[in-house]
C-alpha cells in the first residue's frame, strides 16, 4: 500500500525585505510612475492584506487580484481608496458587485462591458475598467485586428 510522504513545506515573507524591494523598484522606475502590486491567490500565499499594507505604506495604491472575491476581501479589510483591478473577466451577473465595491474590471467583450456600464449607470458611479487585448495566446481579450468591436465599448 502506497502512503504519500508528508513533509513540512511553507513559505514566509520577510516584510523588511519586501519594504526594501518596493523602495528599490520605485527608485528604478522613477517618480510619477504607477506601480500595481499583484496580490493574486492571497498574495501567492503570503497574505494579501498583510502584503497590501506594506505596499500602501510605500505609496503603492493599485493592486491586482485574480478574482472578484479577492477584490471584495481587500475592500472589506479597509482598502477603500486604492484601485483594485480584477485581472480576469467576471460573468455579467456579478457586474453589480464589481460596481458596488468600486473595483476596476478587465473587460474582454462587449457583453461584459455593457453589463458593467449598465450597473454603474444604475448606481450612479463611474467605474474605471481595462480592455483586455488578445496578444496571440487566444485565451481572452479582443482581437487587435477587430478594432470595430473595441470601439463599441467606448
Residue ranges and their predicted role:
Residues 28:
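Conserved PLP-enzyme active-site core in the AAT-like
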Residues 18-21, 25:
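Alpha-helical packing segments of well-folded alpha/beta enzyme cores
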Residues 2-5, 9-12, 20, 33-154:
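Active-site-proximal beta-alpha core segment in soluble small-molecule metabolic enzymes
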Amino acid at each position: 500500500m502506497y502512503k504519500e510522504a508528508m513533509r513540512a513545506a511553507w513559505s514566509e515573507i520577510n516584510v523588511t525585505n519586501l519594504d526594501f524591494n518596493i523602495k528599490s523598484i520605485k527608485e528604478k522606475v522613477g517618480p510619477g510612475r504607477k506601480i500595481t502590486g499583484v496580490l493574486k491567490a492571497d498574495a501567492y500565499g503570503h497574505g494579501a492584506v498583510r502584503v497590501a499594507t506594506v505596499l500602501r505604506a510605500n505609496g503603492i495604491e493599485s493592486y491586482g487580484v485574480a478574482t472578484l472575491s479577492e477584490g471584495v476581501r481587500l475592500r472589506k479589510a479597509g482598502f477603500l481608496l486604492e484601485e483594485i483591478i480584477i485581472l480576469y473577466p467576471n460573468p455579467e451577473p456579478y457586474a453589480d458587485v464589481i460596481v458596488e465595491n468600486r473595483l476596476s474590471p478587465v473587460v474582454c467583450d462587449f457583453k461584459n462591458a455593457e453589463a458593467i456600464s449598465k450597473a454603474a449607470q444604475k448606481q450612479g458611479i463611474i467605474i474605471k475598467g481595462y480592455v483586455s487585448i488578445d496578444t496571440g495566446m487566444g485565451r481572452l481579450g479582443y482581437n487587435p485586428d477587430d478594432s470595430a468591436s473595441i470601439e463599441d465599448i467606448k
